[in-house]
């Protein structure tokens, strides 16, 4: 297996403790019979293409990528990212399958999803669990793993990915009325790093280490990107609104969680009586 690399800005960095095999490598693929069959017949891709016609998925050889992944543990993780950050990437759908029969709470390695302006959701990497999401639409990361973690991922391309409406932010999108649209549009990627500025920073440190050369370079690149966007006063004002909405959403969610805990405690007291 090869060391995994992450694209951040214009450079690529090696992630500690993460290794992978790209099944486009025929010699390696032929050593994994079942994965070779999966890659050659692409039945799952064809089935998804039938079930999701609106995505106009492709099922030809060059449009499908399958990677096997081994996380050694020792804190191995992924920083916040989209699987499709923009042109010329064609990825449309991500399908992750987890292969961890003995996973338990505390082992780490959860997939953490960040639906735009909503509360994050943690997905446990349990054996045979399949997670499917839009490559160009869902911000996510992998939390630090403290035990070996195995999975494979299928990415499927589409020729309609990254249209002009998906990549070009306009003045009409910088208003409250545009928020419902942004929640369901890949255009949210343009604003992602400024809205989730702190989350990006923490995820980089978690992945690359606090004072490593790679983390310093990635943090500097991230900061430069954020500042370049915030130089536009209209963007800066709208981002402040989005951050407030995100904070309020999380505060409301935390209050509901606390309320649920109080109800459970009250129920326990009644049971004890």
Give the role of each language-model region.
Residues 1-52, 169-172, 177, 181, ...:
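Non-heme Fe(II)/2-oxoglutarate
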Residues 184-192, 196:
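Transcription-regulatory cofactor-interaction regions
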Residues 34-170, 269-273:
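Catalytic core of non-heme Fe(II) oxygenases with the double-stranded beta-helix
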């Amino acid at each position: 297996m090869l060391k995994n690399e992450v694209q951040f800005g214009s450079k690529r960095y090696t992630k500690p403790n993460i290794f992978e095999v790209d099944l486009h490598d025929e010699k390696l693929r032929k050593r994994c019979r079942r994965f070779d069959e999966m890659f050659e017949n692409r039945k799952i891709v064809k089935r998804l293409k039938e079930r999701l016609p609106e995505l106009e998925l492709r099922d030809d050889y060059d449009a499908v990528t399958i990677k096997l992944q081994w996380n050694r543990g020792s804190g191995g993780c992924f920083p916040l990212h989209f699987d499709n950050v923009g042109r010329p990437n064609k990825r449309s759908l991500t399908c992750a399958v987890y292969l961890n029969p003995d996973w338990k709470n505390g082992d780490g390695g959860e997939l953490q999803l960040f639906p735009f302006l909503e509360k994050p959701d943690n997905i446990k990497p349990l054996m045979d669990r399949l997670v499917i999401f839009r490559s160009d639409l869902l911000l996510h990361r992998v939390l630090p793993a403290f035990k070996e973690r195995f999975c494979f991922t299928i990415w499927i391309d589409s020729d309609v990915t990254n249209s002009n409406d998906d990549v070009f932010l306009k003045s009409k999108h910088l208003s409250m009325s545009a928020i419902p649209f942004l929640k369901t549009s890949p255009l949210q990627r343009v604003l992602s790093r400024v809205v989730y500025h702190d989350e990006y920073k923490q995820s980089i440190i978690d992945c690359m280490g606090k004072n490593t050369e790679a983390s310093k370079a990635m943090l500097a690149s991230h900061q430069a990107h954020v500042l370049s966007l915030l130089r536009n006063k209209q963007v800066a004002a709208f981002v402040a609104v989005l951050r407030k909405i995100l904070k309020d959403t999380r505060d409301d969610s935390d209050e509901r969680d606390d309320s649920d805990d109080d109800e459970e405690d009250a129920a326990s007291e009644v049971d004890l009586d």
